[in-house]
């Protein structure tokens, strides 16, 4: 692992700490390999299903739910006829506390979004407007190159591979970036000397 002075952007925290340092970071960095392999496998398999059978996300969800409900329905019917126990299904209910907590979370984030939109519309923050405009432009550009399903699958694969790859080969990546930056700086200086030969004479 690189020392803190050699890390990209001179950061002091590790990749694991930047990603939150919890279970999500462990999964993204393949420290829980079974979970990571499962996520990547499901992502690739679902993408192949979507592409091979021309499924949409709604078609897949509807088909899975229909199959699941049919199995449970037939199981319950046969259990009542054959005097067998019914399928052990818990009762799914949303408690009042969960609903209240979700509504508070949603209200806070919607209010933040509305406040940001208001500040941009009133031209109060030019930097924020630039960031939002660039982000929306990039999203529009990406959306024109691929559909939503492909974007979701690609995003999951990127999230599951890039951080782990960077953490494992950080020394090589940082060294390559520094090499490219140095070569770019040398090229810039040569072009500057070529464009302004009087600077070379003065030096």
Curated annotation (Swiss-Prot):
Q: Which InterPro entries match?
A: Reticulon, Reticulon-like
**Keyword Amino-acid biosynthesis annotated:** no
Domain Reticulon residues, every copy: 24-203
A single cellular component GO annotation? endoplasmic reticulum membrane
GO BP of this protein: response to bacterium
The way this protein sits in the membrane is described as:
Multi-pass membrane protein
- Listed transmembrane segments: 34-54, 55-75, 132-152
Q: Where in the cell is it found?
A: Endoplasmic reticulum membrane
The answer to whether keyword Endoplasmic reticulum applies is yes
Identify the stretch annotated as signal peptide in this record.
none
Q: Which UniProt keywords apply?
A: Endoplasmic reticulum, Membrane, Transmembrane, Transmembrane helix
**The protein's name:** Reticulon-like protein B12
Q: Tell me the classification of the organism that encodes this protein.
A: Eukaryota, Viridiplantae, Streptophyta, Embryophyta, Tracheophyta
- Name of encoding gene: RTNLB12
């Amino acid at each position: 692992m690189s020392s803190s002075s050699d890390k990209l952007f001179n950061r002091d925290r590790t990749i694991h700490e930047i990603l939150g340092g919890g279970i999500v970071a462990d999964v993204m960095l393949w420290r829980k390999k079974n979970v990571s392999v499962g996520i990547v496998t499901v992502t690739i398999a679902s993408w192949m299903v979507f592409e091979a059978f021309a499924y949409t996300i709604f078609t897949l969800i509807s088909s899975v739910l229909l199959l699941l409900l049919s199995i449970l329905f037939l199981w319950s019917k046969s259990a009542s006829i054959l005097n067998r126990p019914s399928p052990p299904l818990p009762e799914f209910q949303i408690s009042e506390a969960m609903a209240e907590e979700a509504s508070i979370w949603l209200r806070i984030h919607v209010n933040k979004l509305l406040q940001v939109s208001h500040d941009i519309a009133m031209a109060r923050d030019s930097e924020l407007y630039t960031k939002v405009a660039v982000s929306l432009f990039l999203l529009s550009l990406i959306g024109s190159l691929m559909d939503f399903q492909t974007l979701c699958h690609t995003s999951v694969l990127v999230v599951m591979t890039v951080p782990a790859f960077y953490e494992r080969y950080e020394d090589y990546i940082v060294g390559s970036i520094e090499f490219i930056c140095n070569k770019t700086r040398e090229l810039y200086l040569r072009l500057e000397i070529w464009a302004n030969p009087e600077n070379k004479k003065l030096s």
